[in-house]
């Protein structure tokens, strides 16, 4: 019996069983309802299955890129800290060297006449120059290791460090191959010597066997000794042969490995160069895009703003110039009117009447307007003469501008003749001389 039934009273047990049965029935119904696949869920699952490999590969590449960026930033920070420490160490060494080289007997620089310090002594200038040279030397010595490590970090980022390791492996394999070839030559010589010694011993044995019926006790001892030596020579020859075969196999294996390593290095360098070339190409495209963007920004935004600003400033300057010119002109007219009025007042004070103007009988004149302002007649006549002179000068200037515009706008022979005042013959001669000079200049340039 389960424990939970023992912990409950008997009146509660049927009710608990009914609740459990209803829960199981409800879960079975839900399972039966959920077990039927819906078409929308099926399409989503298929799409998820298709996109899952791409998402996983993209996620892996993103993680690798982030890891590489973090590693590169850590390396850069490490090298910057190392460079800063190297510079500080160089400064400490320089200060220590200066303290050691100082001489207390050669430090007098008091100017007793002016009660100040003497500056720019030759020794001080030389010390400053040497200080800069020594500082540069210390900096170069201290930064040499940093530059080396920075170059190594750059190779790690670009992937050339592996190629460097492969190149070192190839160098080591070449050295091993040379050593193996040298040992192989020695083993071949030893094998040749062993074969020669065995052949000689066999020749001696054969000679003894040919006169076997004529052996003496010395020949028997010689045969026994030669037979033992022949067994030793056979063993030495077999050992030399085995060593030679093993060395030849090793030499062949090293040659094959070296050949494969060289091919691998060539292939990896090609991939690395393609990667660098692709990176430089993308960098060039990015720089070109930035230049085009800057050009568009300058041409579409800055240039119109600059042109509008220049136009506004030019208009303001022209307005100010016209206002200044009108102000000066008004001042001149005011001065002139003041002088004329002073002269007329002086003449009236001395009792001198103004000279009457001669009347014109050819053309009837309109009656003069009444002097309501109380101005004398001489002032009005002077102002009228000044206005007429200004109008005449302005008309002459306007006619001169119109002649120039007409001559530029319609460059005909009659217009040029009327503008320059030359006869037609002179204009033709002038054109002929200009054409001849142009032809001569073109011939000289072409030859």
UniProtKB/Swiss-Prot annotation:
The keyword Electron transport does not apply. It is a multi-pass membrane protein. The keyword Ribosomal protein does not apply. Residues 74-196 form a coiled coil. Required for the maintenance of the structure of the mitochondrial inner membrane. Involved in mitochondrial morphology. Causes growth arrest when highly overexpressed. Homooligomer. This is Sensitive to high expression protein 9 homolog, mitochondrial. It comes from Eremothecium gossypii (strain ATCC 10895 / CBS 109.51 / FGSC 9923 / NRRL Y-1056) (Yeast). The gene is SHE9.
């Amino acid at each position: 019996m389960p424990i939970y039934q023992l912990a409950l009273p008997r009146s509660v047990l049927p009710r608990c069983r009914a609740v459990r049965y209803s829960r199981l029935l409800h879960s079975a119904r839900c399972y039966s309802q959920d077990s039927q696949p819906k078409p929308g869920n099926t399409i989503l699952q298929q799409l998820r299955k298709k996109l899952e490999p791409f998402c996983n590969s993209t996620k892996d590449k993103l993680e690798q890129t982030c890891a590489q960026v973090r590693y590169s930033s850590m390396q850069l920070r490490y090298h910057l800290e190392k460079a800063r420490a190297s510079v500080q160490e160089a400064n400490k060494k320089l200060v220590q060297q200066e303290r050691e080289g100082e001489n207390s007997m050669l430090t007098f620089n008091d100017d007793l006449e002016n009660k100040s310090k003497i500056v720019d002594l030759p020794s001080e200038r030389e010390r400053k120059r040497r200080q800069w040279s020594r500082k540069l030397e210390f900096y170069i010595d201290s930064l040499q290791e940093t530059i080396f490590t920075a170059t190594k970090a750059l190779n790690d980022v670009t992937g050339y460090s592996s190629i460097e390791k492969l190149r070192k492996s190839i160098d080591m394999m070449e050295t091993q191959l040379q050593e193996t070839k040298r040992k192989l030559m020695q083993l071949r010589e030893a094998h040749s010597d062993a074969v020669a010694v065995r052949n000689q011993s066999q020749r001696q044995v054969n000679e003894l066997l040919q006169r076997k019926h004529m052996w003496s006790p010395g020949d028997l001892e010689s045969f026994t000794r030669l037979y033992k030596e022949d067994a030793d020579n056979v063993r030495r020859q077999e050992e030399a042969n085995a060593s030679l075969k093993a060395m030849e196999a090793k030499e062949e294996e090293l040659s094959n490995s070296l050949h494969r390593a060289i091919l691998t290095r060539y292939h990896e360098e090609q991939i690395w160069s393609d990667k660098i070339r692709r990176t430089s190409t993308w960098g060039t495209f990015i720089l070109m895009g930035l230049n085009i963007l800057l050009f568009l920004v300058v041409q579409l935004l800055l240039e119109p703003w600059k042109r509008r600003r220049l136009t506004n400033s030019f208009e303001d300057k022209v307005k100010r110039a016209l206002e200044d010119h009108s102000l000066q002109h008004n001042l001149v007219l005011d001065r002139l009117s003041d002088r004329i009025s002073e002269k007329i007042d002086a003449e009236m004070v001395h009792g001198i009447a103004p000279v009457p103007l001669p009347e014109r009988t050819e053309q009837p004149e309109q009656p003069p307007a009444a002097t309501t302002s109380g101005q004398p007649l001489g002032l009005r006549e002077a102002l009228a003469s000044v206005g007429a002179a200004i109008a005449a000068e302005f008309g002459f200037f306007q006619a001169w501008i119109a002649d120039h515009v007409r001559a530029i706008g319609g460059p005909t022979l009659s217009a040029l003749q009327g503008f320059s005042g030359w006869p037609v013959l002179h204009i033709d001669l002038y054109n002929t001389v200009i054409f001849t000079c142009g032809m001569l200049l073109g011939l000289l340039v072409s030859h």
